[in-house]
Amino acid sequence: QMDHQLIDETGNRFRFSTDGKPGNFVDIVCTPDILQGLPGCGTVHHVAFATKNEQTQKIAQQKLIRFGLNVTPILDREYFHSIYFREPGGILFEIATLPPGFAIDEPLEELGMSLKLPSWEEKNRMAIESALPIINLRLENYKDHGHTNL
């Protein structure tokens, strides 16, 4: 349960929350009789959870180890630190720290305006950029909705 509390159960759907706030819950739908998907489109690659810092991450890591799960060491992903483990059904879970955050290599007001990659992906920049769709963002559509830094 990763410190989540069961707050609702309807049929085969179970809703877990850490604090009851909107967006801070996970729904799990149990369908053990369906066929298992193959890796690719339409399947889950991994599920990521955020944690406050490396200290809370280490606590989660130790709990998972006590549950008998195989958990990775803490991995530095430059923008955050991650641990990974597979749940009994085979889905890869990630627990990532919020710090250091995505503003470590660009000013906050420019966040998201250009593609930033972790150092180990720079060698793949051309291939990554060529596979991305062109996004035509009309910034004027967002200024009236409280987005003042656009």
PLM regions with names:
Residues Q1-F25, D76:
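Core segments of cupin and vicinal oxygen chelate
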Residues V71-H81:
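Conserved blade-ending motifs and adjacent loop-strand segments that build the rim/top face
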Residues G101-P118:
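A short, polar/charged loop-to-alpha-helix boundary motif
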